[in-house]
Amino acid sequence: RREFMKAAALTGALAVSGRLLEGEAGAATPPIDKDLDGVIEMHVHADPDVRARCIDQLTLTRQCKQNGYRGIMYKCHDFIAYLLRATVPGIEVFGGIALNRNYGDTVNVQAAKMATQVTGHYCRCIWMPTYQSAFDMRKKGGGVPVLDAQGKVLPEVVKVMEICADADIIFATGHSSPDECVVLTAKAKEVGVKKAVVTHASQAPWKLSMDQAKACIDNGAYLEHSVLPYFKGPHAVIPGYREQPQVTMEEFASYIALAP
């Protein structure tokens, strides 16, 4: 457990701390930390993106390689994994697609299908809507839905699940609500998805209860735990995070204990 906490803190700090990500690619190569050697980062945002990030994908890919990472998958809203692989050999780079409103007002099946057919086939994840999900936009309205009024998975979402199953890639819940995650993972299991992931399952406002987390695990899904909420709370460096709840390492460990 102590080793997990150390590794999680180190990995997450590298992914989300601008201070650790500063510097030019030509800087002296630091010694590889044994806790980072062979790591695969599965949830990171970098430029180019629809909002400003603290680092671009090329610089981050180079730094991950220098630090001994095996691979990195960008959670971006378009992806350039093919070019990054050609530019920075020696590290596996993957991309994905988040089905937000830039692909339409409903989950876009064709966009998901085409993402799996781009040269190299480096799309490894299709996320349900994130910052434009119906759950995130429940106060404003206009979010992209994943369930119908009766709480059933929409046909277009089922088709995306089928695409993920056929391509053997990740179907991720994005910014779906905790209740939606339980329904989505149950349907994904029924469809035959082998790699269903509940996105940042321990981070508010998408944080699952222990019962919901266990239900998703029973549905065959993996729970993704972003280390970002560890850096939230009253002592957060970023002012906007000070009013948001912190998730302690002990809480992370309690989730992981559900499926040791």
Label every model-predicted segment.
Residues 47-50, 78-83, 101-103, 133-136, ...:
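Active-site environment of divalent metal-dependent phosphoester hydrolases
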Residues 36-55:
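Di-metal (Zn2+ and/or Mg2+/Mn2+) metal-binding site signature of metallo-dependent hydrolases
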Residues 41, 45, 59-82, 91-101, ...:
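Divalent metal-dependent hydrolysis catalytic cores, especially in the metallo-beta-lactamase
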Residues 19-40:
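C-terminal segment of N-terminal export signals and the immediately downstream linker at the start
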Residues 3-24:
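N-terminal export signals
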Residues 102-198, 215, 221-224:
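Extended substrate/RNA-proximal surfaces in nucleic-acid metabolism proteins
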Residues 52, 82-88, 105-111:
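Metal-dependent catalytic neighborhoods of phosphoester/phosphodiester hydrolases
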Residues 125, 163, 184, 190-197, ...:
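Active-site-adjacent C-terminal substructures of enzyme catalytic domains
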